[in-house]
Amino acid sequence: MKKITIAIDGFSSTGKSTLAKQLAKELEYVYVDTGAMYRAVAYFAMQNKFIGADFFNKEALIEALPKIQLEFKFNSDLGFAEMYLNGENVEKQIRTIEVSNFVSKVAEVSEVRSKLVEQQQEMGTNKAIVMDGRDIGTVVFPNAELKIFMTASAETRAQRRFDELQQKGDNVSYEDVLKNVVERDYIDTHREDSPLVIADDAIEIDNSYLNKEEQFAAVLELVNDVVKID
């Protein structure tokens, strides 16, 4: 069976990671959550007081980039790889609303994107990989054999994210989550370096009214068309 690169891009909280994990498991491919990488850098910036509600010391973050070591380590109990920042498991810490509030601002920094894109491209050298993010099909793997672009209404995405955070025990309001989603959309689509856009050869999926099973079945069919699975 031909091994391919699958690029999944789209807006925040569209279920990119969930779909990518499902595909990687089904195909026995490597899964890389690039959003976790940017979240880890944002968390690092927060911990080192480089960014806050009303300030962002980009120069300090850029200077500290060589000190940031990111690594995915597979957790057999959970069935997926967790993010490690300088040797520490930060999978839980990077999923908070606080990190969500800053991740798009950190991802705007060209030096951050350059460092992470290079690392992501190295991960995909041997294909057989599913990678999700904002610029996978346009920048990281412009020659990917299959490109998916996922979208849904801001309200639908905010509700999904709110429900997820509630299940984790995070005390947040729907209004705050919706505000975060809208702000991230604007920053992601308006940044100068690698803005969020749909690749010319990507297949767009609006999953506002699709459940996970319907979405997975549709995308798996697309994969089968590309790799010619009988």
UniProtKB/Swiss-Prot annotation:
Against Pfam families, the record matches this protein to: Cytidylate_kin
Which GO MF terms does the UniProt record name? ATP binding; CMP kinase activity; dCMP kinase activity
Membrane-traversing stretches: none
GO cellular component terms listed in the entry, alphabetical order: cytosol
Per the UniProt entry, what are the Gene Ontology biological process annotations, in alphabetical order?
Answer: nucleobase-containing small molecule interconversion; pyrimidine nucleotide metabolic process
- Tell me yes or no: is Manganese among this UniProt entry's keywords: no
Its family remark reads: Belongs to the cytidylate kinase family. Type 1 subfamily.
> What are the protein's UniProt keywords?
ATP-binding, Cytoplasm, Kinase, Nucleotide-binding, Transferase
Q: What is this protein called?
A: Cytidylate kinase
Report the domain of life of the source organism: Bacteria
Q: Which reaction does it catalyse?
A: CMP + ATP = CDP + ADP; dCMP + ATP = dCDP + ADP
Q: What is its main location?
A: cytoplasm
Question: Where does the chain bind ATP?
Answer: G10, F11, S12, S13, T14, G15, K16, S17, T18
- Localization annotation: Cytoplasm
EC numbers listed for it are 2.7.4.25
- Asked if the record carries the keyword Cytoplasm, the reply is yes
